[in-house]
């Protein structure tokens, strides 16, 4: 599937992801494969099966794909991003223990990153800028 440029070209591929994730939902609802989705307990298991040729591709969040391609996979290729379904949006955050003395410090740092535009610049560079993958439809 390395040369795929459309969702239609993915329908007969064996695609894997971690069970119980929004990535699974995206495969089911966006790709709508003609094959059974290969589900794994962890994304590490899915990438291991991809590397060994047991599955044709994986679906997960874009930052993880870039990391795996650059640091873990031998010859990995990112063909693109799936379009959103409109029903869910990926959101990430920082988790601290309740009552952590770091809470105020982390909030202050995030507010400062937002205020001076650094957060938007980081998002553009790492999530949606030149390092992003094209939307495939």
Summary of predicted features, one role per range:
Residues 1-137:
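Proline/Glycine/Serine-rich low-complexity intrinsically disordered segments
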